[in-house]
Amino acid sequence: MKHWKRRSSAVFAIVLQVLVLLLPDPAVAMTMEQFLTSLDMIRSGCAPKFKLKTEDLDRLRVGDFNFPPSQDLMCYTKCVSLMAGTVNKKGEFNAPKALAQLPHLVPPEMMEMSRKSVEACRDTHKQFKESCERVYQTAKCFSENADGQFMWP
């Protein structure tokens, strides 16, 4: 478990460093191209840890949660959210932190939809006991409240 934590921390640090390089001026918002690149980087950091089908990951990418998730897929969503710093190890979503990070995580054209989704889904995790399912169901809620604009690593 400690090895996974160290590896996760290292991957997260690399992702943050690349994002800093992509956004040299903190006052400049992330472009859609940079956003898509960051999704790919996060996916490459989390996906190898789980037994996942590329087709399932591609469906999540476009907000399609209309298929039965495997435990690995649900835990993949937790890995992604841990990397983003929006959940804790118990799968509890931190809406204030997510709202504060939105300007650094999404391009301006997705900002309003993202805020709306965070507000609508802030307590979704409380309906579930298992940590991976908590995060998966929160991500699914985001998708359902995103007016067709949702994207996931």
From Swiss-Prot:
Query: Where does the record locate the signal sequence feature?
Result: 1-29
Query: Which residues does the annotation say bind 1-propanol?
Result: S81, T86
One Gene Ontology term of the biological-process aspect is: response to ethanol
Q: Does the keyword Nucleotide-binding apply?
A: no
Could you tell me which Pfam families the record lists for this protein? PBP_GOBP
Q: Which SUPFAM superfamilies match?
A: Insect pheromone/odorant-binding proteins
Molecular functions (GO terms): dibutyl phthalate binding; diphenyl phthalate binding; odorant binding; pheromone binding
Gene3D superfamilies, per database record: Pheromone/general odorant binding protein domain
Please tell me where butan-1-ol binds in this chain.
Answer: S81, T86
Report the SMART domains cross-referenced here.
PhBP (SM00708)
Q: Where does ethanol bind?
A: S81, T86
Q: Name any GO cellular component annotation.
A: extracellular region
Subcellular locations according to the entry: Secreted
What is this protein's tissue specificity according to the annotation?
Answer: Specifically expressed in chemosensory system in both males and females. Expressed in a subset of trichoid chemosensory sensilla located on the ventral-lateral surface of the third antennal segment. Secreted from non-neuronal support cells into the sensillum lymph that bathes the olfactory neurons within these sensilla.
Q: Which InterPro entries match?
A: PBP/GOBP, PBP_GOBP_sf
Cysteine disulfide links: C46-C79, C75-C132, C121-C141
Keyword annotations = Behavior, Disulfide bond, Olfaction, Pheromone response, Pheromone-binding, Secreted, Sensory transduction, Signal, Transport
What PANTHER family does this protein map onto? GENERAL ODORANT-BINDING PROTEIN 19A (PTHR21364), GENERAL ODORANT-BINDING PROTEIN LUSH (PTHR21364:SF1)
Similarity remark: Belongs to the PBP/GOBP family.
Function (record text): Odorant-binding protein required for olfactory behavior and for activity of pheromone-sensitive neurons. Binds to alcohols and mediates avoidance behavior to high concentrations of alcohols, the alcohol-binding possibly resulting in activation of receptors on T2B neurons, the activation of these receptors inhibiting these neurons. Acts in concert with Snmp and lush to capture cVA molecules on the surface of Or67d expressing olfactory dendrites and facilitate their transfer to the odorant-receptor Orco complex. Required for cVA response, probably by binding to VA.
Protein name per Swiss-Prot or TrEMBL: General odorant-binding protein lush
